[in-house]
Amino acid sequence: MAPLSSSTREVFSEAVRAVLETWPVLQIAVDNGFGGAFSQQKAEWMVDALQQYFTDNGDLQPDEVEDFISELMNNEFDTVVDDGSLPQVAQQVCGMFQQCEQGRLAEVREQILKLNQKKTSSGRAKATPAQTPQDDDDDDEEEAMDCEGGSAGASVSSTAVNDLHHEEEEDDGWTVVRRKK
C-alpha cells in the first residue's frame, strides 16, 4: 500500500467525519454526554484516530475496523453498540478508504456531500424518556396521597394539600371531614 497524499488524506478524513457525524449511536452518545464533559472533543478525536488507524495499518478488513470502532465507543463513551449499525459504519469507512486509495476522490466527495445533506435534513437524535399526560396525572395523585399520610419527613404542608383537595371535593358536592391533629 502506497502512503496517501496529503490531499487524499484530507478527503478521507472528511469522509470519516461525515460518516461518524451521521451515525446516530455516536451522536446520541455525544448529545447525552456519555463521554463526560468532553464528549464532543472525544468525537472529534475519534475521527482523527480512525483516520490514523487506516494510515498506520495496511489492508484493513471491515471486521477489524468494526472492532476498533467498538473499542473506541466502549472506552471513550462507555457505550456498547448492539443495534447492528457498527458493521455498516465499518463497511462504509472501508469502502471510502479503498476509493481514496484508487484515486476516486470525486466519488468520495459525492458521498460526503450526500452524508452532509442527510445530516442537515435529519437533525440530531436525542435519547429522552417520553412521559404521557396520563403518567403525569398519576404521579401528582401519588404525591398528594403521600403528603396526606402525615409523615414526619414530608416537605409539603398537609394543609396546602388538604386545601387543594377541599376545593376539588366541594366543587363535586361532597362535604370534607378533617381529623384533628
Swiss-Prot record:
The keyword Thylakoid does not apply. Pfam families: WGG. One of its GO terms (cellular component) is nucleus. Keywords: rRNA processing. Residues 118-181 are annotated as: Disordered. Residues 134-146 have a biased composition (Acidic residues). Residues 118-133 have a biased composition (Polar residues). May be involved in 20S pre-rRNA processing. This is Pre-rRNA-processing protein TSR2 homolog. The keyword rRNA processing applies. Belongs to the TSR2 family. GO terms for biological process: maturation of SSU-rRNA from tricistronic rRNA transcript (SSU-rRNA, 5.8S rRNA, LSU-rRNA). PANTHER family: PRE-RRNA-PROCESSING PROTEIN TSR2 HOMOLOG.
